[in-house]
Protein backbone atom coordinates (compact mmCIF):
# COMPACT_ATOMS: atom_id res chain seq x y z
CA UNK A 1 0.00 0.00 0.00
CA UNK A 2 1.17 3.51 -0.77
CA UNK A 3 1.30 5.74 2.28
CA UNK A 4 2.06 8.77 0.15
CA UNK A 5 -1.39 9.32 -1.35
CA UNK A 6 -4.68 8.92 0.49
CA UNK A 7 -7.44 8.75 -2.09
CA UNK A 8 -10.15 8.98 0.57
CA UNK A 9 -8.75 12.25 1.90
CA UNK A 10 -8.14 13.77 -1.52
CA UNK A 11 -10.08 16.87 -2.48
CA UNK A 12 -10.15 17.15 -6.25
CA UNK A 13 -10.48 20.58 -7.89
CA UNK A 14 -13.64 19.85 -9.84
CA UNK A 15 -14.44 22.18 -12.72
CA UNK A 16 -17.68 24.06 -13.07
CA UNK A 17 -20.19 22.39 -15.35
CA UNK A 18 -20.44 23.90 -18.85
CA UNK A 19 -23.15 26.49 -19.39
CA UNK A 20 -26.22 24.88 -20.92
CA UNK A 21 -26.67 25.90 -24.55
CA UNK A 22 -29.90 26.65 -26.37
CA UNK A 23 -30.86 24.62 -29.45
CA UNK A 24 -29.84 27.51 -31.70
CA UNK A 25 -26.47 27.84 -29.96
CA UNK A 26 -25.84 24.10 -30.29
CA UNK A 27 -26.60 24.24 -34.00
CA UNK A 28 -24.30 27.23 -34.48
CA UNK A 29 -21.41 25.55 -32.66
CA UNK A 30 -21.89 22.27 -34.53
CA UNK A 31 -21.76 24.14 -37.84
CA UNK A 32 -18.65 26.02 -36.73
CA UNK A 33 -16.89 22.87 -35.56
CA UNK A 34 -17.56 21.09 -38.84
CA UNK A 35 -16.07 24.04 -40.73
CA UNK A 36 -13.01 24.24 -38.46
CA UNK A 37 -12.35 20.51 -38.77
CA UNK A 38 -12.16 20.90 -42.53
CA UNK A 39 -10.04 24.05 -42.40
CA UNK A 40 -7.55 22.50 -39.98
CA UNK A 41 -7.39 19.11 -41.73
CA UNK A 42 -8.55 17.67 -38.41
CA UNK A 43 -10.49 14.66 -37.21
CA UNK A 44 -12.35 14.43 -33.92
CA UNK A 45 -12.06 11.45 -31.57
CA UNK A 46 -14.36 11.26 -28.55
CA UNK A 47 -14.40 9.02 -25.51
CA UNK A 48 -17.39 6.91 -24.52
CA UNK A 49 -17.82 9.05 -21.40
CA UNK A 50 -18.31 12.39 -23.19
CA UNK A 51 -21.84 13.72 -23.61
CA UNK A 52 -24.03 12.15 -26.33
CA UNK A 53 -24.02 15.36 -28.41
CA UNK A 54 -20.22 15.19 -28.60
CA UNK A 55 -20.14 11.51 -29.51
CA UNK A 56 -22.72 12.06 -32.25
CA UNK A 57 -20.71 14.95 -33.70
CA UNK A 58 -17.53 12.87 -33.78
CA UNK A 59 -19.32 10.16 -35.75
CA UNK A 60 -21.01 12.62 -38.11
CA UNK A 61 -17.69 14.23 -39.03
CA UNK A 62 -15.83 11.01 -39.82
CA UNK A 63 -14.16 10.61 -36.44
CA UNK A 64 -14.70 7.90 -33.88
CA UNK A 65 -16.14 7.20 -30.46
CA UNK A 66 -14.04 4.71 -28.53
CA UNK A 67 -12.03 3.90 -25.43
CA UNK A 68 -8.79 5.74 -24.74
CA UNK A 69 -6.41 3.42 -26.57
CA UNK A 70 -8.61 2.96 -29.62
CA UNK A 71 -9.02 6.74 -29.87
CA UNK A 72 -5.24 7.09 -30.09
CA UNK A 73 -4.89 4.21 -32.55
CA UNK A 74 -7.65 5.58 -34.79
CA UNK A 75 -5.91 8.94 -34.84
CA UNK A 76 -2.52 7.44 -35.65
CA UNK A 77 -3.98 5.62 -38.66
CA UNK A 78 -6.04 8.57 -39.94
CA UNK A 79 -4.67 10.84 -42.66
CA UNK A 80 -5.64 14.07 -40.84
CA UNK A 81 -2.78 16.31 -39.72
CA UNK A 82 -4.60 17.31 -36.53
CA UNK A 83 -6.50 15.31 -33.91
CA UNK A 84 -9.11 16.93 -31.71
CA UNK A 85 -9.31 14.70 -28.62
CA UNK A 86 -12.56 15.03 -26.67
CA UNK A 87 -11.65 13.36 -23.41
CA UNK A 88 -9.25 13.94 -20.53
CA UNK A 89 -5.62 14.98 -20.66
CA UNK A 90 -3.94 11.56 -20.45
CA UNK A 91 -5.93 10.58 -23.56
CA UNK A 92 -4.45 13.50 -25.45
CA UNK A 93 -1.00 12.46 -24.24
CA UNK A 94 -1.55 8.89 -25.42
CA UNK A 95 -2.56 10.21 -28.83
CA UNK A 96 0.64 12.29 -28.98
CA UNK A 97 2.75 9.29 -27.93
CA UNK A 98 1.38 7.27 -30.87
CA UNK A 99 1.26 10.21 -33.32
CA UNK A 100 4.21 12.52 -32.62
CA UNK A 101 4.02 14.03 -36.09
CA UNK A 102 0.43 15.22 -35.63
CA UNK A 103 -0.94 18.27 -33.86
CA UNK A 104 -3.00 17.07 -30.88
CA UNK A 105 -5.62 19.55 -29.66
CA UNK A 106 -8.03 19.29 -26.74
CA UNK A 107 -11.04 21.42 -25.80
CA UNK A 108 -9.20 22.17 -22.56
CA UNK A 109 -5.98 20.96 -20.96
CA UNK A 110 -7.68 21.29 -17.56
CA UNK A 111 -9.72 18.12 -18.11
CA UNK A 112 -8.07 15.78 -15.62
CA UNK A 113 -8.57 12.22 -14.38
CA UNK A 114 -8.66 11.30 -10.69
CA UNK A 115 -6.49 8.24 -11.40
CA UNK A 116 -3.87 10.43 -13.07
CA UNK A 117 -4.05 13.09 -10.35
CA UNK A 118 -3.80 10.36 -7.73
CA UNK A 119 -0.49 9.09 -9.10
CA UNK A 120 1.95 12.03 -9.26
CA UNK A 121 5.24 11.07 -10.88
CA UNK A 122 7.61 12.16 -8.08
CA UNK A 123 5.78 10.20 -5.38
CA UNK A 124 5.26 7.23 -7.66
CA UNK A 125 8.94 7.12 -8.63
CA UNK A 126 9.93 7.05 -4.96
CA UNK A 127 7.44 4.25 -4.37
CA UNK A 128 8.94 2.24 -7.24
CA UNK A 129 12.49 2.94 -6.06
CA UNK A 130 11.56 1.53 -2.64
CA UNK A 131 10.62 -1.79 -4.29
CA UNK A 132 13.31 -2.37 -6.96
CA UNK A 133 12.61 -6.11 -7.13
CA UNK A 134 9.11 -5.56 -8.56
CA UNK A 135 7.97 -5.19 -12.16
CA UNK A 136 6.07 -1.92 -12.61
CA UNK A 137 2.72 -2.23 -14.39
CA UNK A 138 0.62 0.91 -14.87
CA UNK A 139 -2.87 1.39 -16.16
CA UNK A 140 -3.38 3.44 -19.33
CA UNK A 141 -5.13 6.09 -17.20
CA UNK A 142 -1.82 7.71 -16.22
CA UNK A 143 0.39 10.57 -17.34
CA UNK A 144 3.10 10.13 -19.95
CA UNK A 145 5.67 10.54 -17.17
CA UNK A 146 4.22 7.65 -15.14
CA UNK A 147 4.05 5.48 -18.26
CA UNK A 148 7.71 6.22 -18.95
CA UNK A 149 8.58 5.05 -15.41
CA UNK A 150 6.82 1.72 -15.96
CA UNK A 151 7.87 -1.60 -17.42
CA UNK A 152 4.41 -2.26 -18.84
CA UNK A 153 1.31 -0.24 -19.70
CA UNK A 154 -1.92 -2.23 -19.46
CA UNK A 155 -5.63 -1.83 -20.18
CA UNK A 156 -8.46 -3.38 -18.23
CA UNK A 157 -9.31 -5.70 -21.13
CA UNK A 158 -5.93 -7.44 -21.01
CA UNK A 159 -4.88 -6.91 -17.40
CA UNK A 160 -5.64 -10.42 -16.13
CA UNK A 161 -3.82 -12.13 -19.01
CA UNK A 162 -0.74 -9.94 -18.65
CA UNK A 163 -0.47 -10.38 -14.89
CA UNK A 164 -0.95 -14.15 -15.26
CA UNK A 165 1.95 -14.12 -17.72
CA UNK A 166 4.22 -12.11 -15.43
CA UNK A 167 3.26 -14.26 -12.45
CA UNK A 168 4.16 -17.41 -14.40
CA UNK A 169 7.64 -15.94 -14.82
CA UNK A 170 7.91 -15.52 -11.05
CA UNK A 171 7.73 -11.74 -11.18
CA UNK A 172 6.34 -9.64 -8.34
CA UNK A 173 4.25 -6.66 -9.38
CA UNK A 174 3.75 -3.01 -8.56
CA UNK A 175 0.31 -2.07 -9.85
CA UNK A 176 -0.79 1.52 -10.34
CA UNK A 177 -2.81 3.56 -10.00
CA UNK A 178 -6.28 2.01 -9.54
CA UNK A 179 -6.58 0.08 -6.28
CA UNK A 180 -9.90 -1.56 -7.17
CA UNK A 181 -8.72 -2.85 -10.54
CA UNK A 182 -5.46 -3.99 -8.94
CA UNK A 183 -7.37 -5.93 -6.29
CA UNK A 184 -9.65 -7.42 -8.96
CA UNK A 185 -6.66 -8.62 -10.98
CA UNK A 186 -4.99 -9.99 -7.84
CA UNK A 187 -8.11 -12.01 -6.99
CA UNK A 188 -8.26 -13.39 -10.53
CA UNK A 189 -4.58 -14.37 -10.70
CA UNK A 190 -3.32 -14.80 -7.10
CA UNK A 191 -0.20 -12.89 -8.20
CA UNK A 192 2.02 -11.01 -5.75
CA UNK A 193 0.76 -7.46 -6.36
CA UNK A 194 1.58 -4.32 -4.42
CA UNK A 195 -1.11 -1.74 -5.24
CA UNK A 196 -0.80 2.00 -5.43
CA UNK A 197 -3.85 3.45 -3.71
CA UNK A 198 -5.77 5.62 -6.15
CA UNK A 199 -9.30 5.30 -7.51
CA UNK A 200 -11.63 6.53 -10.23
CA UNK A 201 -13.98 9.06 -8.72
CA UNK A 202 -16.92 7.76 -10.77
CA UNK A 203 -16.57 4.03 -10.14
CA UNK A 204 -15.54 4.49 -6.51
CA UNK A 205 -18.98 5.94 -5.74
CA UNK A 206 -21.19 3.02 -6.70
CA UNK A 207 -22.86 1.78 -3.52
CA UNK A 208 -23.48 -1.86 -2.64
CA UNK A 209 -26.70 -1.60 -0.64
CA UNK A 210 -28.27 0.75 -3.16
CA UNK A 211 -27.35 -1.63 -5.99
CA UNK A 212 -28.82 -4.57 -4.08
CA UNK A 213 -32.06 -2.63 -3.65
CA UNK A 214 -32.08 -1.79 -7.34
CA UNK A 215 -31.65 -5.48 -8.20
CA UNK A 216 -34.78 -6.18 -6.15
CA UNK A 217 -36.67 -3.56 -8.17
CA UNK A 218 -35.39 -5.02 -11.45
CA UNK A 219 -34.95 -8.75 -10.73
CA UNK A 220 -34.64 -9.65 -14.42
CA UNK A 221 -31.89 -7.12 -15.12
CA UNK A 222 -28.24 -7.99 -15.71
CA UNK A 223 -25.62 -5.98 -13.82
CA UNK A 224 -22.68 -4.69 -15.88
CA UNK A 225 -19.69 -3.45 -13.89
CA UNK A 226 -16.38 -1.82 -14.76
CA UNK A 227 -13.51 -3.37 -12.73
CA UNK A 228 -12.49 0.07 -11.43
CA UNK A 229 -15.46 -0.33 -9.07
CA UNK A 230 -15.13 -1.54 -5.46
CA UNK A 231 -15.01 -5.31 -4.91
CA UNK A 232 -18.47 -5.44 -3.35
CA UNK A 233 -19.92 -3.97 -6.56
CA UNK A 234 -17.92 -6.33 -8.78
CA UNK A 235 -19.24 -9.26 -6.73
CA UNK A 236 -22.81 -8.35 -7.76
CA UNK A 237 -22.00 -8.28 -11.48
CA UNK A 238 -23.22 -10.53 -14.26
CA UNK A 239 -20.45 -9.15 -16.46
CA UNK A 240 -17.22 -7.31 -15.59
CA UNK A 241 -15.14 -5.56 -18.22
CA UNK A 242 -13.72 -2.50 -19.91
CA UNK A 243 -15.96 -0.01 -21.69
CA UNK A 244 -15.83 -1.95 -24.96
CA UNK A 245 -16.35 -5.26 -23.18
CA UNK A 246 -19.41 -3.91 -21.35
CA UNK A 247 -20.96 -2.79 -24.63
CA UNK A 248 -20.32 -6.27 -26.03
CA UNK A 249 -21.82 -7.87 -22.92
CA UNK A 250 -24.96 -5.76 -23.29
CA UNK A 251 -25.30 -7.11 -26.83
CA UNK A 252 -24.72 -10.76 -26.00
CA UNK A 253 -26.52 -11.20 -22.67
CA UNK A 254 -30.16 -12.29 -23.09
CA UNK A 255 -31.50 -9.87 -20.46
CA UNK A 256 -33.79 -7.08 -21.68
CA UNK A 257 -32.72 -4.71 -18.90
CA UNK A 258 -29.16 -3.72 -17.94
CA UNK A 259 -28.05 -2.01 -14.73
CA UNK A 260 -24.81 -0.32 -15.76
CA UNK A 261 -22.12 0.56 -13.20
CA UNK A 262 -19.87 2.88 -15.14
CA UNK A 263 -20.01 6.46 -16.42
CA UNK A 264 -23.42 7.12 -17.95
CA UNK A 265 -21.78 8.54 -21.06
CA UNK A 266 -21.43 4.94 -22.26
CA UNK A 267 -25.21 4.77 -22.76
CA UNK A 268 -24.95 6.52 -26.15
CA UNK A 269 -22.95 3.72 -27.82
CA UNK A 270 -24.49 0.96 -25.72
CA UNK A 271 -28.00 2.00 -26.80
CA UNK A 272 -26.84 2.09 -30.42
CA UNK A 273 -25.60 -1.48 -30.04
CA UNK A 274 -28.74 -2.61 -28.16
CA UNK A 275 -31.67 -0.43 -29.27
CA UNK A 276 -34.18 -2.94 -27.91
CA UNK A 277 -32.78 -3.01 -24.37
CA UNK A 278 -33.45 -0.77 -21.37
CA UNK A 279 -30.34 0.72 -19.76
CA UNK A 280 -30.44 1.74 -16.11
CA UNK A 281 -27.86 3.75 -14.19
CA UNK A 282 -26.38 1.99 -11.19
CA UNK A 283 -26.84 4.04 -7.99
CA UNK A 284 -24.03 6.19 -6.60
CA UNK A 285 -23.77 7.98 -3.26
CA UNK A 286 -26.61 10.25 -4.27
CA UNK A 287 -27.19 13.41 -6.23
CA UNK A 288 -25.92 16.96 -5.78
CA UNK A 289 -23.91 17.57 -2.64
CA UNK A 290 -24.05 13.94 -1.52
CA UNK A 291 -21.93 12.58 -4.36
CA UNK A 292 -18.82 13.77 -6.15
CA UNK A 293 -19.50 12.40 -9.63
CA UNK A 294 -23.11 11.15 -9.72
CA UNK A 295 -22.06 8.58 -12.38
CA UNK A 296 -20.57 11.14 -14.73
CA UNK A 297 -16.96 12.31 -14.78
CA UNK A 298 -16.88 16.06 -14.08
CA UNK A 299 -13.81 16.50 -16.29
CA UNK A 300 -15.40 14.66 -19.23
CA UNK A 301 -18.25 17.16 -18.94
CA UNK A 302 -15.78 19.93 -19.84
CA UNK A 303 -15.79 18.70 -23.44
CA UNK A 304 -18.68 20.88 -24.52
CA UNK A 305 -19.40 22.23 -28.00
CA UNK A 306 -18.08 25.71 -27.19
CA UNK A 307 -14.85 24.30 -25.75
CA UNK A 308 -14.33 22.10 -28.82
CA UNK A 309 -14.85 25.06 -31.14
CA UNK A 310 -12.43 27.15 -29.07
CA UNK A 311 -9.81 24.39 -29.16
CA UNK A 312 -9.96 24.12 -32.93
CA UNK A 313 -10.06 27.87 -33.49
CA UNK A 314 -7.43 28.97 -30.97
CA UNK A 315 -4.99 26.06 -30.65
CA UNK A 316 -1.87 27.22 -28.84
CA UNK A 317 -0.65 26.50 -25.33
CA UNK A 318 -4.14 26.30 -23.82
CA UNK A 319 -5.21 23.50 -26.14
CA UNK A 320 -2.22 21.68 -27.68
CA UNK A 321 -0.63 18.58 -26.16
CA UNK A 322 3.17 18.74 -26.24
CA UNK A 323 5.49 15.99 -24.97
CA UNK A 324 9.27 16.13 -25.23
CA UNK A 325 10.87 13.42 -27.34
CA UNK A 326 12.69 11.66 -24.51
CA UNK A 327 9.52 11.33 -22.43
CA UNK A 328 7.46 10.22 -25.42
CA UNK A 329 10.00 7.55 -26.37
CA UNK A 330 10.15 6.35 -22.76
CA UNK A 331 6.37 6.02 -22.56
CA UNK A 332 6.18 4.30 -25.94
CA UNK A 333 8.38 1.38 -24.78
CA UNK A 334 5.96 -0.13 -22.21
CA UNK A 335 2.97 0.69 -24.42
CA UNK A 336 4.48 -1.17 -27.38
CA UNK A 337 5.44 -4.02 -25.04
CA UNK A 338 1.75 -4.50 -24.19
CA UNK A 339 0.67 -4.33 -27.83
CA UNK A 340 3.28 -6.92 -28.82
CA UNK A 341 2.18 -9.20 -25.97
CA UNK A 342 -1.43 -8.93 -27.09
CA UNK A 343 -0.53 -9.60 -30.71
CA UNK A 344 1.43 -12.71 -29.77
CA UNK A 345 -1.56 -14.03 -27.83
CA UNK A 346 -3.94 -12.87 -30.57
CA UNK A 347 -5.86 -10.83 -28.01
CA UNK A 348 -7.93 -7.82 -28.95
CA UNK A 349 -6.65 -4.95 -26.82
CA UNK A 350 -9.31 -2.51 -25.75
CA UNK A 351 -8.94 0.47 -23.51
CA UNK A 352 -10.36 1.29 -20.14
CA UNK A 353 -12.17 4.31 -19.17
Swiss-Prot record:
> SUPFAM superfamilies, from UniProt?
NadA-like (SSF142754)
Positions with a binding annotation for [4Fe-4S] cluster:
113, 200, 297
Q: How is the cofactor bound?
A: Binds 1 [4Fe-4S] cluster per subunit.
Q: Which InterPro entries match?
A: NadA, NadA_sf, Quinolinate_synth_A_type1
Give the record's pathway: Cofactor biosynthesis; NAD(+) biosynthesis; quinolinate from iminoaspartate: step 1/1
Listed EC numbers: 2.5.1.72
Q: What family name appears in the similarity comment?
A: Belongs to the quinolinate synthase family. Type 1 subfamily.
Q: Write the protein's name.
A: Quinolinate synthase
Species for this entry: Erwinia tasmaniensis (strain DSM 17950 / CFBP 7177 / CIP 109463 / NCPPB 4357 / Et1/99)
List the gene name. nadA
Amino acid sequence: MSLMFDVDAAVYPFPAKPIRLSSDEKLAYRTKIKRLLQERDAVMVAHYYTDPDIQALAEETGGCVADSLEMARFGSQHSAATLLVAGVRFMGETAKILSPEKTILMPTLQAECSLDLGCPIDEFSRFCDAHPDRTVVVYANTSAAVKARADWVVTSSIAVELIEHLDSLGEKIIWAPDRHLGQYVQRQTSADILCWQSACIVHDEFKTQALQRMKLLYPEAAVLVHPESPQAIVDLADAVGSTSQLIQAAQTLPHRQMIVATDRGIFYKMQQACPDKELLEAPTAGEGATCRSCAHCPWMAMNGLKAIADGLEQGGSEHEILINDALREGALIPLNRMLTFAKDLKLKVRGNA
